[in-house]
């Protein structure tokens, strides 16, 4: 009898001890004897655990076997977008850590390498993730010419080119960035043109009173009010995932009437002056490009380094105090540093740039100037002379490797500064200028790593730095 009892105890006791041991191990793995949090398990595992527990505890009760199914909450569109961005951030971190990029072959058209990039691995992987993931919704509200249209030539041309590309061309077969519906978008584009507003609403300007920005503020505020009331997206982020792009001098003033309301709003500006409210962590600088009519870029007339006989060159009007200082020291005074307020008959602007080693890029009335891009197009090393100018694409491009920055108070020393640059360093800078050109070229339709994609990448980087609450 005792032997049978011992056997019975062993048969029953061993499973009981095993269950107690497993229970102890499971619950002791969580601090303070708390039950494991439900989010620790996937929804599938949690449902399975609950069903089996009910069956074991109340096998005689039919109601426990047919308890209402557990509903799994579907992720919202915003949660899906945030998860996509989280994966992109993780991929970029891995690329930086392991100095290696992962990509689908279809998006490999160019591999960023070399000194011109602050971190080539981060930039390459970021561009890959942008090509795979990034979706932008261009609002449909509003009518031309103030919205969905803009100048496509001259110094404001990049404004209209970008609006046209994002609103129309990118909706075709190559439109990988254009969201098919707003719920898919990671960022939202306000496609109004400051240049067109000034042209159609303000012209002709006949008195100082005509420069008042009140009408510009009213048009912009009304447009944002319309999209904010019609769609949930502005209020969802307080405007942090919304952006505009403009090269007009008045563009920085757009949100001035409601600074608190627009404090998170991203502005892509040519006039990226940090002393006039440009915020590097929110706004982004875009290049001012003088786009010729019926063309996308000027003719290339650049010479090899050995054929560049002019040390430094500038030609332009005396707009602003910086150029006045430049003219007072160098206009018509030196054969090596050639500075003109106008060119005489027979002189070709692009040919002179093509024969120059360094191209002077002084700010005009505003900090931005098309001179930097003109220099880059021609293989001439830009010499940036400005105060408080945040250079285009400075997040990813290291301008010190392909340009020279000279403070305004050093203008009298321009020749000395440039002559002291060793020849081998100049040659490296020249090669870097030739390499960085692709990032300032306008293509239609846009191509990977060109200027339109670089503008989008500036938006993408800032969107990656925003985590919206779900």
From Swiss-Prot:
Chain positions carrying an annotated carbohydrate: 100, 235, 273, 307, 388
Keyword Nucleus part of the UniProt annotation: no
Leading EC class: transferase
GO molecular function: glycosyltransferase activity
Predominant location category: Golgi
Alphabetical UniProt keywords: Cell wall biogenesis/degradation, Glycoprotein, Glycosyltransferase, Golgi apparatus, Membrane, Signal-anchor, Transferase, Transmembrane, Transmembrane helix
A biological process from GO: protein glycosylation
Topological domains annotated Cytoplasmic: 1-7
Membrane topology (UniProt): Single-pass type II membrane protein
Record InterPro entries: Exostosin, Exostosin_GT47
Recorded phenotype for the gene knockout or disruption: No visible phenotype.
Xref: Pfam families: Exostosin_GT47 (PF03016)
Segments on the Lumenal side according to the record's topology features: 29-470
GO CC, any one term: Golgi membrane
EC number(s) from the headed UniProt entry: 2.4.-.-
Keyword Kinase: no
Residue stretches spanning the membrane: 8-28
Subcellular location: Golgi apparatus membrane
PANTHER family: BNAA09G42910D PROTEIN, EXOSTOSIN HEPARAN SULFATE GLYCOSYLTRANSFERASE -RELATED
Annotated family: Belongs to the glycosyltransferase 47 family.
Function: May be involved in cell wall biosynthesis.
UniProt-recorded name of the protein: Probable glycosyltransferase At3g42180
